[in-house]
Structures are given as C-alpha cells and as structure tokens.
C-alpha cells in the first residue's frame, strides 16, 4: 500500500527540494496534513524515546503490513516535526535534519529505529576515528545524521559498554545453532525453489536477517531474537540502519516475527530497494575492505531465496536486460546463488562489526564461512560478475539516467570483446583488474551482449569509413574539386536511348493534290518563301492542316491567331515531319510559334517524366530577355497541355532554377552559359540531357558566332545524336550557315523575304550629322512623335553602342522632361527584367538600350526606333530596325551616321537596297569614300556577323574573380591551380616587362643619355665615374672642395622636403652610377619605383642616391631634339656593389608593379562598355 514515504515523486530521490525546502516554506500546512491525531509530539526526553522504541519496535514488525503500520509513520513524522523546533534549527545538524526528512519519505523504513540508530552511529564514529571516513560516506549516501539531537546522543552513550558483551555471546551461539539447522535443511532440500526454503520454520530468523540485509522492509530489519540481533548487525545499516549494540539490548524482549516472506513479496518497494542496494555497494567500495565482495554474495544468496533476485532483476537491471541482453548472465547467477553459505558469512560479518563499529553496513553472511569453502569458490565468478553489475547500476541509479547506463554497458562490452579477440589486450586488462575472474566473467558477459552492441557498431563503422580510405581517393577527390566545373563528355555508343517518334505530319488531301507549280506559286504568294532540301512538304494554309491536338488548337484560337504567317506555313509541316530545319524570316514574322507548336506535339507523344529525369525540349537563346519572352509565349499552352517549363538564364539565383528542374520540367528555355552551370552543378545530379530529343536554337546566327559557339557545341555534344534540331533567326550569314550545318542532319532551309532584310513595313531613315547635332535631332524626332494624340501611347526605343553612352543619354533626356529608362548588360538581371516589363506596360514611353535589347524584343505600340549610335554590321542593323513594324504594323527606324563612321555606312546602304528603299546621297558618299580606301589598302572591309571574344575572356574573368576570393578568404584550396595561374600570370608579366624594359644605361657626366645600349636580359651594368683630368691632385684641395660641396648642400636642406634625396646634379655624387628607364612601364610599375616609401627603404639599405630624371612621354611618342629624355631613374653610389643592389631592388619593384598591373587588368578588364561606379 502506498504511504507518505513513497519515493515515486517527480523529484529525484537525492534532491531536497521536494522535502526540506517545502517543509521550511509550508511548515504549518504540510504538517497539518501529515500529523493530525499523532501522539508523543511533546516528548523530547531521551528516556521516553528509548522506552517508545523498546516498546514499539517488535510490535511494529509484527504488524508490518497491517493497517497499523501507518501509525508508525505518523509517530515518526511527529518526531520529525518536533525536530523542527527553534533549538533544533540552531543546531549544527540542521542540514542533516533536512536530509533525514528527505530520506524518510521512502515507504519501507522504520523511522524510529533509524533515528535511534543514527544516535548510536554518531557515538561510534566518535569512538572509532579510524573508520571515520568510511562511516561518513555511508551517512552521505544513505542516512547521514538523520535528525539525531545532541541530547539523544549523550543519553545513549553510557548504554554501549553494558550491551557489548552479551550481544557477542548470544550472536555466536545463535549463529552456530542457525548454521546447524540450516545445513540440515539444505541437505534435505536440494531444489532451487525459493518458497520451499522460506516455508520451513527453522531458517525463519535467517530469512529475516537476509531480508534486513537486502533492505526490503523495515519490518524484516527489526531483531527477532538475540541470535537474530547478531545477524542484524551486518545488514542493519543498509535496510534500517540499526546499531547491533542497541539491538542486543532489546533482544530478549523481541518475539519471532510472523510469516515474513509473504509480506516481503507483497511489498511494492522495488525502486527503493534498488537504490538502497546501490548505496550499500558504494559504501562498501569506499571503505576499501574485504567485505565488499561479500556484499554481493549475500545479495546473491538472498536471490536464491526469491527475495533479492526479483528486485535485482526487476529494478537494478531492468533497463540493462532489455537493451543489452543480460538474460544469459542472469540465469547463470541464479544457478550459482542457491548455495547455502549465508549463515557462516553472516557470522563472520558480525565479528567484523564488533571489531569495527561502523562496518555494520558492509557485513555479509558469507565472509567467515568455515565449512562451505568449496561452494564459495565455485561462486566466485558469479559474485564478481554481480559486483560489476552493481557498480554499473550504482552510477546509473544515482544519476537516474538510462542513457548513461546504456553507454556504460556498451563500454564494458567493447572492452570485453577486445579481451576475447586479442590475448595481449586480455593480459593488459588482467593487470588493470584487481581480480582475474572478473575479466573472465566480463568476457563471458560480453558474449551475451554482442548482438545488442549498437553503439559500438556505429563507432566501428564510422572509424572504418575514415581510417580505411585510400589516400589516392582523397587526392583524386581534392583534385576533382579544384577543377573547373565542366560537363563530362558523353559516349553515346555506351548509352541506350529510348526510341522516339519524329513524324507527326500527314499531308492533307487537298495539299496532296496540289502540283509542284501550284506549290511554288503558293510560296511566292507567302512573301516569296525559298526552300532548299529534299522532300520539302508543301506549305499549309490553315491550322487544321497541321495535325495538332484539340487542346493546342483551342489555345491558338483563344490567342487570336486566325491564320499562319509565311514562316509558320512552311516551317510547321517541315518540323512536324521530323526534319531538321533552318528558318530565316524577317523580324516579327512569328518564328517563335513556328518552333513552339511542333515541340508541344513532339513532347506529348513521349512518356511522362519520371523522377530526376531531364527535359525533352531544349530551347537556347543568346540573350536573357529573349529567353524570358519565349518562356512567356509558352505559358498559354503549358496549362492546357499539362506541361512544365523552366526559364534558366544568368543573373538570376541558380538555386531557384535548380529547384524547378528537380521538380521536373519537359521544356527548358535557357542561355548557354547558365545551361552549362546547371549541367555541371552537383556533379551533374541536377539535370541531364538524356531525354532531350527536340533542340531549338533561336537567333542561331548569334549562337554560332565566336562568343557562343564553343558553349553551344559543348551542350549539343551531350544530347543524343538522333535528336531533332531546329534553327531560327532573322539574319543568317553564309559563314554562319556552314558552321550550323555541322550540327544538322539533311536539313530543310526555309528563307522568307531574304536572309538579312528589314521588313518592308518599316520606314528607314538614315541621316549623316555631327556628334553635337545628334541629340538635338533626337529631341526633334521625339517631339514630332508625341505631338499628336494618336501617338500618345506610342513607344520609342533608342539604341547606343556603349553602356556609358546609355546612362549619359538617359540623364540628358530626363533633364528635357522625357520619362525614360536604360537597359544594358551592366545592370542586374532583375533591373533588366523589370525595365522591359515597365516599358511594355507603358509606364515610361522611351527606352535607351544597347544591342542587348535588339533581338527578340516584342513590344506593341513601338513606332520609333532610333539608332543614336550606328550599328557596326548589317545583322545588328536589321535586328535593331526589326523591333518596330512587327506583325504587319508600320514603324520608323532612324539611324544617325557621323563622318568618321563611313565603315558602317556600307552595311546600312546594303540593308536599304535589299529592302527596296533609296540610299541617301550623303550615305552613298560615305560608302564610296570607304570603298576607295579599301582599294587603296588604307582600310579593311568589315566582315558580317557579331564576332566576339570567345570563352577565353570569360574564363579569364572567372579565374580572376576566383583568385580574388581566394586571396580574400584564404580558403587553403589554392593548390596546383593557383600555382599554375600564378606561373601564367608571371609569364605574362615577364613578357610585358621584357617588352618595356630598357637596358641599364651607363652615362657620362656631361651626356647622361649616352650610350643607349639596351640589355633585354635585364643585366645590371654599373659604370664608374670618369675622372676629370683637370681636377687637382692635391688631397687637401679635394678635401676643401668636398667640404664646400657639403656646405652648399646643407644650406639648401631646409628648402627640400623630408625624404626626398638631395639633387646630385647628375652622376657626379658617387664613384659609380647606373640608369633605369621607366617611361614605358605601366603606371603602377612607375609608381612602385618612385614613391617615397620604397625609395627611402632602398636608400637606407644601400646608401645610394636615387633620382628620377627626364619627362614622361605617352606610348608611341618620342622626345624631340632639345627635349628632356624619357623618364628614367639615376642610381649613384660609392661602391659598385651598392649600386648593383639598389638597381636589383628597383628592378624587383618594377616587376612587382608590372605584375600588379596585369593582375588588375585581368581582375577588372576594361570592357570599353560600362563600369559601375
């Protein structure tokens, strides 16, 4: 039954919060609940307390499990409440009293007995100082100074000598009698059942003694007879903390207790018993005496009777048994513990208790056995094993931490496994262990736990993964991480691709009946379509003839596409037939829909995408704006067809694009650079091109130009060879066509209206004017456009050739009152996107842009395009002018030419002629003038196409940025790559240094520029100063002239700045001199050898004189007669070695400055376009 002393509270057993602190704060309320109706509250005399103890102890045990047992707790609580008096709080034992109150909450304690026992124990501690340390530890762990008063100690002191003699004799006699009876009973009974041993009347007292030792119940720990008192002396401190001398006093009055076994079995105090047993093991271990193993023996024997076994298995090892598999060990322990040794051990333990008064906590029944030596020897292994388990449970129970218990058991198991595997480790463990059997038991113990070695296995696996790694693998991984991200080359012969369907077009009957002549006439009517190739399908006239699905046709109808454009009529049936197509058509002719609609039909025919599969349709564009526009054109079809598309371009966060690709997308619209980044990201796990069967290159001429061609070819090489490839552009030069045909298979070439022709709906105006008049003319054009109401919502697009010019023109137009914005490659992508959207929405009517907005930009109401700076080739002009006059609308394109831009006039005049417009006379004059210069060899004819700097410049910029980050953050991963790049950079610097390095010149006093020998190897040549033959040979005269010279210099010392060398008037100040020309070095190099800091260091180190002479001349300019020579440095010194060292240092600074200049150029290359300030 649950009592007030129950320890099943939220607070830990060892904490004082739930008892002492609460007792202090809520004294009255708490004691009213616990102490109503209790007696003996006012008695504080020792005599009365002793009488109460003598009278009630035996009766307390007799009614152990009766209802009256609660009264004993109440009596104890009354006594405890008495202790909280004013005098008690002034006592030194105030903290001990709190501990006593805390410990008294356990359910199975005889509090009055413990109170008296604490008094006697304090007295024994005073008498026997040798055992003070051990005694104090037991008091700390279990019941230190449990509220005993000083008066009670004094009263109990004289009673000890009178009780010592008879207690010993009675205990010895009683123990011999019990031993004989127990041996007879054991010989008669050889079964291991516990209840049969308990049912016998002979060993009843033995059971009670054993019960008190195990600490099951306060009732069991009370003495039954004089012989029992002697037995109780050993385990009393553990269960009830009774003094054997105090027990002997009342031995004659104590009757035998009723059936103890049944009561003990019914006691639900397993948790408390486990804690008590753990505390006893700790006390025994702390004492350092031999009885420590005996404690385990006693507990083992108790287990054989069915008392301790249940508690040990259920309480102390419940967690360990479940998690680590102690079942085999437990069965072995029960098998060995049934041997009949407790009486002899207990007798010997009582002798130990007589010798050491404080050893009653540690005395066991098996220390002094005389007849059971063989049985004890057989049980040694099990006892040592039990001791190990108890030591483990001590830490675990005290801390209340099951995780620590599991870890401790795991450590023990790992050690045991090592002992089994390695004899040397076993031997070392044997040396470390105090007893060899303990090691054997541990090894045997670990075998039972091996299947459950969870933590040990995990640690072993992790150590193996790190420790057994091959060094070459790590080096390979490191070198791989250093390499630049690149797409791995795919061997298509080793990859099995899924077959796919290419032909979806079936020629309608009305077109099949059409003859070739009729088809040619139809193509002529459709803006003069020109086709090249084999088996070209006839152009269609209606959407219904294209073989499209109903969903696609519904979207087309909703978009308002009533009829097909010329390029669509010919390109859609050609693409739907599965052929590779090159489509060239004028701007604004619907080329985007010509390749999008067949792509949707192509994708829907294939199986859906699975997890981590790449796209099916790939569309690449040269500009980010064009990619965004194509992606926007796809959206109406995506929802109807249940498809997904991703737009991937640089400038936007790549993580968002990666997330979209991982979710799956059938279509990806991208720029080449970002596509390479995505393919190389995460070692190619983001996306792949295995399922790509439909590739579109929009603005294909730009894609195959020098800037994009390597990237495009790198991507196409990773796509399956039997793909369908489609190329579209408004301009397609012949040289680009030859390059593009390498990627196609038997293509059909479709040209509508000419290869690079401006649409006839566009009015082209070309004017030749000065640079100053261009802005005024621009204001005039804008004023005329927005002067009428019908053009109120019109848009104007102004093209310039440089980023700085765009911002400058923006500022000027804003001052004139025109709301406008600018767009160019120097702006962030988010700014470019928002600017395009605002311009299309009409938020501002004027947009200033570079050629980045020349391709693919489709803006409604765009009626005026102004080429403020003339385009540099034909294709750029066509695309710029093609931003207006789209989809049949009219527009105007105005181009400004200056006198010095005659090389651009040739392409502009050609575009005018091809579009059927007249060439102005001023423009024709510029054309004729340029052609004459070409014939004369003064000029070179310009090639068509955009050209570009290729990937080398991009790689250089990326490498420079990466090196800058490495220097900033010092990642420690520079390694070989950094060394190689440093070598390349040094080589470049050496080349430039050698180009501009002038040899060290030796000069005479009168002619410093002679001789002018150049030493490209950078050898330092030092010349000795020539001696004037007219100079006086008298040493005194030399001294006088030197003194005069010094005075002359000192007189000017105050005039000169600090740190500046004194003017030495040429090479007369030292015996040796040398010169170093620095005029043609970069600015940083010149600054490195002329700034005062560096020069002062050299002067201090070498003792020379360094002077900067001459004048600086720009590159290509030579000094005229009578002018100062080019900038050079004069070094003078008294010894040749000093001059040589100074020159070497100056040349080193020159090299470093040159390298720094090269590095700065590669880090921030002068693009000549735009620089963000």
Swiss-Prot record:
Q: Where is this region: Disordered?
A: 1-232, 268-418, 938-989
Gene Ontology MF term list? ATP binding; ATP hydrolysis activity; nucleic acid binding; RNA helicase activity
Motif Q motif mapped to chain: 541-569
Where does the record place a coiled coil?
Answer: none
Domain Helicase C-terminal, residue spans: 761-927
Positions with biased composition (Polar residues)? 219-228, 270-290
What does the entry's free-text domain comment contain?
The Q motif is unique to and characteristic of the DEAD box family of RNA helicases and controls ATP binding and hydrolysis.
**Alphabetized PANTHER family for the sequence:** ATP-DEPENDENT RNA HELICASE DBP3 (PTHR47958)
Q: What is this protein called?
A: Pre-mRNA-processing ATP-dependent RNA helicase prp5
């Amino acid at each position: 039954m649950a009592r007030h002393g129950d320890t099943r509270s939220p607070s830990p057993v060892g904490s004082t919060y739930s008892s002492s602190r609460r007792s202090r704060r809520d004294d009255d309320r708490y004691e009213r609940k616990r102490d109503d109706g209790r007696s003996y509250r006012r008695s504080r005399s020792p005599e009365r307390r002793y009488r109460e103890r003598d009278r009630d102890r035996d009766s307390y045990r007799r009614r152990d499990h009766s209802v009256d047992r609660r009264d004993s707790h109440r009596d104890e609580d009354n006594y405890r409440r008495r202790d909280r008096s004013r005098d008690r709080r002034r006592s030194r034992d105030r903290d001990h009293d709190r501990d006593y109150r805390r410990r008294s909450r356990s359910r199975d304690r005889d509090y009055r007995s413990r109170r008296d026992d604490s008094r006697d124990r304090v007295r024994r501690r005073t008498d026997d100082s040798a055992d003070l340390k051990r005694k104090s530890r037991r008091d700390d762990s279990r019941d230190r100074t449990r509220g005993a008063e000083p008066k009670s100690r004094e009263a109990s002191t004289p009673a000890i000598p009178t009780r010592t003699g008879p207690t010993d004799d009675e205990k010895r006699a009683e123990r011999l009698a019990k031993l004989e009876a127990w041996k007879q009973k054991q010989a008669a009974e050889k079964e291991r059942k516990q209840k049969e041993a308990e049912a016998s009347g002979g060993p009843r007292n033995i059971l009670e003694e054993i019960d008190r030792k195990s600490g099951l119940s306060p009732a069991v720990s009370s003495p039954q007879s004089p012989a029992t008192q002697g037995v109780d002396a050993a385990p009393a401190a553990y269960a009830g903390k009774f003094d054997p001398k105090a027990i002997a006093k009342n031995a004659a009055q104590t009757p035998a207790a009723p059936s103890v076994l049944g009561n003990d079995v019914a006691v639900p105090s397993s948790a408390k018993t486990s804690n008590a047993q753990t505390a006893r093991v700790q006390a025994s271990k702390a004492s350092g005496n031999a009885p420590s193993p005996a404690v385990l023996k006693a507990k083992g024997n108790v287990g054989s009777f069915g008392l301790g076994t249940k508690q040990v298995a259920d309480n102390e090892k419940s967690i360990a048994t479940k998690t680590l598999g102690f079942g085999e060990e437990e069965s072995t322990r029960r098998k060995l513990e049934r041997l009949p040794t407790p009486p002899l051990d207990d007798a010997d333990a009582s002798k130990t208790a007589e010798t050491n008064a404080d050893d009653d906590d540690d005395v066991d029944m098996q220390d002094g056995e005389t007849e059971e030596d063989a049985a004890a020897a057989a049980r040694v292994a099990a006892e040592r094993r039990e001791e190990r388990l108890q030591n483990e449970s001590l830490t675990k129970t005290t801390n209340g931490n099951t995780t620590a218990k599991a870890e401790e058991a795991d450590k023990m198991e790992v050690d045991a496994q090592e002992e089994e595997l390695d004899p040397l480790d076993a031997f070392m463990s044997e040396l470390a262990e105090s007893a060899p059997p303990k090691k054997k038991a541990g090894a045997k113990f670990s075998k039972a736990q091996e299947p459950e070695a969870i933590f040990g296995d995990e640690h072993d696996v992790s150590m193996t993964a790190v420790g057994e790694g091959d060094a070459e693998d790590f080096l390979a991984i490191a070198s791989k991480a250093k390499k630049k991200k690149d797409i791995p080359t795919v061997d298509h012969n080793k990859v099995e691709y899924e077959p796919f369907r290419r032909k979806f077009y079936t020629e309608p009957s009305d077109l099949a009946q059409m003859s070739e002549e009729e088809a040619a006439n139809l193509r002529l009517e459709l803006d003069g379509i020109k086709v090249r190739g084999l088996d070209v399908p006839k152009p269609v006239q209606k959407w219904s003839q294209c073989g499209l699905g109903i969903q696609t046709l519904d979207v087309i109808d909703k978009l308002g596409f009533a009829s097909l454009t010329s390029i669509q009529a010919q390109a859609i049936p050609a693409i739907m037939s599965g052929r590779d197509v090159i489509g060239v058509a004028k701007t604004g002719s619907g080329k985007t829909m010509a390749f999008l609609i067949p792509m949707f039909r192509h994708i829907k025919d294939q199986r859906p995408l699975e997890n981590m599969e790449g796209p099916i349709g790939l569309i690449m564009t040269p500009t980010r704006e064009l990619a965004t526009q194509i992606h926007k054109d796809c959206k109406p079809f995506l929802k109807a067809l249940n498809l997904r598309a991703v737009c991937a371009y640089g400038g936007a966060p790549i993580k968002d694009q990666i997330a979209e690709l991982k979710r799956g997308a059938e279509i990806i619209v991208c720029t080449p650079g970002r596509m390479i980044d995505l393919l190389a990201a995460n070692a190619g796990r983001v996306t792949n091109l295995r399922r790509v069967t439909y590739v579109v290159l929009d603005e294909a001429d730009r894609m195959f130009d020098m800037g994009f061609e390597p990237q495009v070819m790198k991507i196409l090489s990773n796509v399956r060879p039997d793909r369908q490839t489609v190329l579209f552009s408004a301009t397609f030069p012949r040289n680009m066509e030859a390059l593009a045909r390498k990627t196609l298979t038997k293509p059909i070439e479709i040209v509508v209206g000419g290869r690079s022709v401006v649409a006839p709906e566009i009015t082209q105006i070309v004017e030749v004017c000065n640079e100053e008049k261009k802005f005024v003319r621009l204001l005039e054009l804008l004023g005329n456009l927005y002067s009428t109401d019908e053009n109120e919502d019109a848009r104007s697009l102004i093209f310039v050739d440089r980023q700085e010019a765009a911002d400058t023109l923006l500022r000027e137009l804003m001052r004139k009152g025109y709301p406008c914005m600018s767009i160019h490659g120097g702006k962030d992508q988010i700014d470019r996107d928002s600017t395009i959207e605002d311009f299309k929405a009409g938020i501002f009517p004027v947009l200033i842009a570079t050629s980045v907005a020349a391709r693919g930009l489709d803006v409604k109401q765009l009626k005026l395009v102004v080429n403020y700076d003339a385009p540099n080739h034909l294709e750029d002009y066509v695309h710029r002018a093609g931003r207006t006059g789209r989809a049949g609308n009219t527009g105007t394109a105005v181009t400004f030419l200056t006198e010095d831009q005659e090389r651009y006039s040739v392409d502009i005049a050609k575009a005018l002629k091809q579009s059927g417009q007249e060439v102005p006379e001023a423009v024709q004059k510029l054309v004729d003038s340029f052609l004459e210069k070409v014939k004369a060899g003064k000029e070179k004819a310009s090639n068509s196409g955009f050209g570009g700097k290729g990937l080398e410049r991009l790689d250089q910029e990326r490498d420079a940025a990466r090196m800058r980050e490495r220097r900033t953050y010092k990642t420690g991963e520079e390694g070989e790559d950094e060394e190689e790049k440093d070598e390349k950079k040094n080589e470049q610097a050496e080349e430039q240094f050698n180009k501009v390095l002038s040899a060290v010149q030796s000069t005479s006093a009168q002619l410093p520029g002679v001789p002018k020998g150049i030493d490209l190897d950078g050898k330092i040549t030092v010349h000795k100063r020539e001696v004037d033959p007219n100079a006086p040979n008298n040493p005194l005269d030399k001294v006088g002239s030197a003194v005069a010279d010094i005075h002359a210099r000192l007189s000017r010392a105050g005039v000169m700045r600090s740190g500046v060398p004194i003017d030495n008037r040429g090479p007369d100040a030292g015996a040796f001199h040398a010169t170093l020309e620095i005029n043609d070095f970069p600015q940083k190099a010149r600054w490195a050898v002329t700034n005062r800091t560096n020069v002062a260091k050299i002067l201090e180190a070498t003792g020379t004189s360094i002077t900067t002479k001459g004048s600086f001349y720009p590159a290509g300019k030579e000094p005229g007669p009578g002018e100062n020579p080019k900038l050079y440095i004069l070094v003078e010194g008294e010894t040749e070695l000093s001059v040589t060292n100074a020159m070497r240092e100056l040349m080193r600074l020159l090299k470093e400055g040159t390298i720094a200049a090269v590095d700065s150029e590669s880090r921030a290359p002068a693009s000549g376009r735009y620089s963000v300030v």
